[in-house]
């Protein structure tokens, strides 16, 4: 069945080279950049999956190279089973559910399915949806479904196995210069969801079919790094990894690599404005980064809501505040929101998608997108007479 969900109105709006290992005390924490609020602008919002009765959770998205076809996958209930998938052929304005076209076993894949496009060194494209475990939490690690025809058909693939025991599957992936792809994830002892957490990485050289044995790349005494998001510097020479800090006693964490992930610097604090959970972002045509996440910055007026940070790689690298933040969606369920998909369309529209309880009442979480352009946001900053940094 094809369901078309139109624009729907509803009411609701580092990396820092300080001294390595330097962290900030709570007393220092306060907003240090402008904050815009578009969370009440319902004409910007699209419902991908409505949570009238069912909790729709933890989406990720993928935009194909044609600039219009977008996929969204998510789980049922908080960290629950996979199964839902939707496709948009108009850049996220309307969506068609594909659940009944997927392998039967996909509904047995557990926790936060994540969709990626991996191109192997020979140029072969594959779409992948990885999840954390098969059958139940703690089951065989990282099962997946895969498509070799741009998402027209899918087949179930075997789990990657015990070396990949995880809390969540890959939080992010990035192509490397040699044509391989780096993937990053996190776990606790024995793969359990408990402290101390550590971040691991693995590399595929055949488009996702096989992966190297994972190695630990971030472990911080007294902190719990997790949910890594890796991005590349504008000159292409450096990787940066932003990480959630799960004790939530300070800022988020970041680290850098100048050799394609072979070695990483010691994790340090991000700028205040990048403090949050489950970072995911994109680079705009003018070179800036827009990174969305669940706001967990101390003393933030948008704490617990779905926000985006706007700034340059230099801001991240040198610990600067950035240009501004945007409150994208308001959560009516505390901090239970903010696992995002982020896509940039050819007309410069940014489509930021998350799970969120977007209204008061008995309704549960929905998968919702917020749409905006940086030019619009820049102009609003100018109107407040706050110069762009």
What does each model-identified segment do?
Residues 1-14:
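Bacterial N-terminal signal peptides that target proteins for export
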Residues 4, 22-24, 35:
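Intrinsically disordered, low-complexity peptide-like regions
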Residues 6-9, 20, 70, 205:
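N-terminal compositionally biased, intrinsically disordered segments and leader/signal-like regions
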Residues 12-13, 20, 132:
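N-terminal leader/targeting segments
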Residues 18-31:
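Bacterial Sec-dependent signal peptides at the C-terminal "C-region" and cleavage site
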Residues 28-389:
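Asp-box/BNR beta-propeller blade signature and adjacent active/binding-site loops
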